[in-house]
């Protein structure tokens, strides 16, 4: 399942994502979870997938990552995850994607030292996301 989740989330970052983003960035809902303490930004994607980001990640980049995940999960854009089995699995694994400022950052170290779950489907870094260049790896 981990390979499926990684593929599900990471491949479309190279593809085209929707340009209109309708997600709200919220405060980290789990500030007492040691693995998640470095993150100040949070987006719930369709009730089954979470995105956590460091404060240095722009809101545009966080929303873009959420839009890519949502487009994969809800390709017909009706607000419902297209495959209920995937939705159930994502919920049961507490699926999430952390976005770090850089590889080897203190937030990344804190996260991986303290994270004990199975829900990390992909890891993103700030320089890998460019909302203005959908379909291309950000630089």
Across the structure, where does each feature detected by a protein language model lie?
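Sec-dependent N-terminal signal peptides
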Residues: 4-13
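Ser/Thr/Asn(+Pro)-rich, low-complexity disordered segments
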Residues: 27-43, 61
């Amino acid at each position: 399942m981990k390979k499926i989740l990684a593929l599900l989330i990471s491949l479309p970052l190279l593809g085209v994502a929707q340009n209109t983003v309708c997600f709200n960035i919220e405060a980290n809902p789990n500030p007492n979870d040691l693995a998640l303490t470095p993150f100040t930004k949070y987006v719930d994607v369709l009730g089954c997938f979470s995105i956590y980001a460091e404060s240095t990640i722009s809101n545009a980049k966080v929303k873009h990552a959420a839009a890519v995940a949502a487009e994969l999960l809800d390709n017909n854009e009706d607000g419902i995850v297209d495959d209920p089995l995937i939705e159930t699995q994502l919920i049961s694994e507490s699926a999430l994607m952390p976005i770090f400022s850089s590889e080897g950052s203190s937030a990344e170290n804190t996260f991986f030292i303290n994270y004990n779950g199975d829900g990390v489907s992909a890891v993103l870094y700030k320089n890998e996301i460019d909302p203005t260049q959908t379909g291309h790896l950000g630089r």
